[in-house]
């Protein structure tokens, strides 16, 4: 039988994850930024990327937030049917307790960006809850929890559309990226969800961002599917737009394009 998972295990794990992602960039993102820095020809863009990398190192060393916007929390949970869960509380409540604990940590208090009664008084909840939680079930003996913090700059640039069969996904994406400006703090990763109904497509887009930065591996081996061809074409052509780091021009607007 698998190890017993308690309520406190869940709370502490989520709290720790919220703190961890507040001051550590993923390694694949840092590698992508270093490569972008090394390849950049524009002095302004190179300086902007350099500042992001310096900030990343300082935050990692000092355990301080990477940005003043510490995001709204997105949690993806896979509940194994064989998992040994020793809980009596609602799982969603436990996850939110973990978020509250992580964001109110006195050693590194994070910004609270969530309000109650959003159509009315808009009162800050003072602990960044509730999180946006997605739960699925599999046949494992594990409880898999992925925690992400999504900043408002990029989240507010999210787009959705219903295309006609004759419409071009490529054209729609390119048109929207051109108009987004730099409010989403490029260089970043573009996540695209295709198919299903409206909420499914948006969820796929968010889930795609959980993948590793691997566009250069894809370029090296070559596209093997239409989606991979679309990824490469969008990656190349978006970076030709000249938006660049923090909107200052240059060669790198996106580090990767993800599609599910």
Regions found by a protein language model. Give the residues of each.
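Non-transmembrane, aqueous-exposed alpha-helical and coiled segments at domain scale
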Residues: 1-260
């Amino acid at each position: 039988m698998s190890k017993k998972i308690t309520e406190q295990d869940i709370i502490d794990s989520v709290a720790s994850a919220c703190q961890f992602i507040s001051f550590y960039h993923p390694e694949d993102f840092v590698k992508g930024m270093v490569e972008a820095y090394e390849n950049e020809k524009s002095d302004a863009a190179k300086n902007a990327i350099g500042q992001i990398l310096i900030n990343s190192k300082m935050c990692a060393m000092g355990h301080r937030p990477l940005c003043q916007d510490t995001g709204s929390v997105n949690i993806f949970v896979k509940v194994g049917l064989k998992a040994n869960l020793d809980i009596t509380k609602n799982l969603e409540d436990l996850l939110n307790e973990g978020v509250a604990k992580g964001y109110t940590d006195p050693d590194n208090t994070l910004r609270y960006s969530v309000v109650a009664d959003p159509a009315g008084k808009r009162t800050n909840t003072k602990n960044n809850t509730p999180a946006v939680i997605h739960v699925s079930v599999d046949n494992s003996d594990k409880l898999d929890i992925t925690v992400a913090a999504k900043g408002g700059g990029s989240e507010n640039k999210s787009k959705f559309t219903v295309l006609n069969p004759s419409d071009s996904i490529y054209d729609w994406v390119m048109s929207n990226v051109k108009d987004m400006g730099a409010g989403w703090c490029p260089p970043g990763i573009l996540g695209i969800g295709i198919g299903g109904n409206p909420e499914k497509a948006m969820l796929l887009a968010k889930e795609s961002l959980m993948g590793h930065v691997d566009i250069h591996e894809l370029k090296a081996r070559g596209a093997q599917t239409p989606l991979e061809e679309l990824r490469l074409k969008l990656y190349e052509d978006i970076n030709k737009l000249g938006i660049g780091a923090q909107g200052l021009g240059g060669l790198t607007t996106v580090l990767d394009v993800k599609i599910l």
